[in-house]
Amino acid sequence: METYAFVHFGLNTFNDREWGYGDSDPKTFNPARLDCEQWVQTFVNSGMKGVILTAKHHDGFCLWPTQLTEYCIRNTPYKDGKGDIVRELSDACKKYGIKFAVYLSPWDRHQANYGTPEYVDYFYKQLHELLTNYGDVFEIWFDGANGGDGWYGGAKDARTIDRKTYYDYPRAYKMIDELQPQAVIFSDGGPGCRWVGNENGFAGATNWSFLRAGEVYPGYPKYRELQYGHADGNQWVAAECDVSIRPGWFYHPEEDDKVKTVDQLTDLYYRSVGHNATLLLNFPVDLSLIHISEPTRPLYIS
């Protein structure tokens, strides 16, 4: 794949937040002029092979009309509640011949039952919806940020989970293997591909595509070693370098003059793809939602 796009978009975009608390009003989500086809055309013209969408970030808001929660696009002004950003982007990818993938945050700061076994069942039902309604996906992205404070149905407290066991990830792997056997599974330790241990877009000058099986898990405390891999590893888990074209992952107007330059992006390419990894470059969608800049300029959604 070499290079592919990340798109962070959701309620955070309209509320100037990075990590939504889970209490933002869905009525604030109204991308009246959104054009997913133009995003994809620009990605294609820039040589990217695919795109990963934040279908649900930590705030719990869903960009598809899930039947599992009211905290979703069905209850927004967008297309009078009949919109589906996941479908619009996946259809655009099919039309222009690049691959589509989804990010699904395991952590959910909106759901009242987060931290209980019932939430895990809810999470897997969401995953099943995404795996069965939108065609082929090339990657499933599980974020390592899990547990902490949140709205949690109005409780407004902090919740701690056992990151090694709470989500029962082998259950996810089995579901994905059955429903989307071609999909690569991303998490801190894979099993398909791994986090590189930083969000700066680079891997170590020596970067092994191996980890010691069973050692790395979401929230792994020695994450900085992931930029190098394990020279004595026995499981193939290639590195993926994720980085945003702006300081933040979601759009913030005060960062309009902080877009990475062509020289900076070129350096990131050499320090990621050139260091035996792939480059996942994030584009924060802004409030105008009109277009992505031409690929001959620094790439950003403007």
Mark where each language-model region is.
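Mature catalytic domains of secreted/periplasmic carbohydrate-active enzymes
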Residues: 1-293, 297
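Hydrophobic alpha-helical segments, chiefly the membrane-spanning helices
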Residues: 301-302
